[in-house]
UniProtKB/Swiss-Prot annotation:
It comes from Francisella tularensis subsp. holarctica (strain LVS). This is 3-deoxy-manno-octulosonate cytidylyltransferase. It catalyses: 3-deoxy-alpha-D-manno-oct-2-ulosonate + CTP = CMP-3-deoxy-beta-D-manno-octulosonate + diphosphate. Its EC number is 2.7.7.38. Activates KDO (a required 8-carbon sugar) for incorporation into bacterial lipopolysaccharide in Gram-negative bacteria. It is found in: Cytoplasm. It holds the Pfam family CTP_transf_3. InterPro entries: Cytidylyl_trans, KdsB, Nucleotide-diphossugar_trans.
Amino acid sequence: MANIHIVIPARLKSTRLPNKMLADIAGKPMIQRVYEQVTKSKFDSIIIATDSQKIKDIAESFGAKVVLTRDDHQSGTDRIAEAVTKLGFAYEDIVVNVQGDEPLIPIENIEQAAQLLIDKSEAVVSTLCEKITDVEDIYNPNNVKVVFDKNNYALYFSRASIPFERGFSEKEQINISEFFRHIGIYAYRVAFLKHYAELTVSPIEKYEALEQLRVLYNGYKIAIEQSAKSTPAGVDTLQDLEKVRKLFNV
């Protein structure tokens, strides 16, 4: 039986919010908040994959297992691919990528993503989404939108508003079409993870800065379904960080 592992990619030099992995949230760095949240799950192991000796030292100080990776990876998935190779995970094992900037991610959603990959044998990756109810979120590029087919396989991910109902204003869109926000959690089998790092990086991946588009561009399937529980958006900006801090201080 395949083991299931959680790997948290943690890059120090974030472009939108520098050093956010170490940002203080109610007395603890964000990476520790994420780690402590995912330890509530019952998976076989939890690893932090980072390019930073500073993050490694801090993470090990609170008991995390850490793999130090190169600092030139194009995405968190590339970083995880290096980490699982170093760790020697079996090809049939499943790895769940939990973003290092989502300290409030529900454990139920992590388990759901892993089970979805097990259930959808044609998919090489699984992920989650939730319905957008606020029109402003449709046009926020930090909220990645997704459209999917009738069999719950992703068609496209974008920072733009997709779909778009022609003939209606931007404010009217929310009442016409269904919009779904992608939740940045992925499950993959180790065999595909190792292959992912060798795949062609497409122009659309570079334009959108979305690593999952590499999977679609190269002809593979991503299974997707609505999350069991609502997931607060990740921390991309200082405003996001302040919102999360308030939630922890309640």
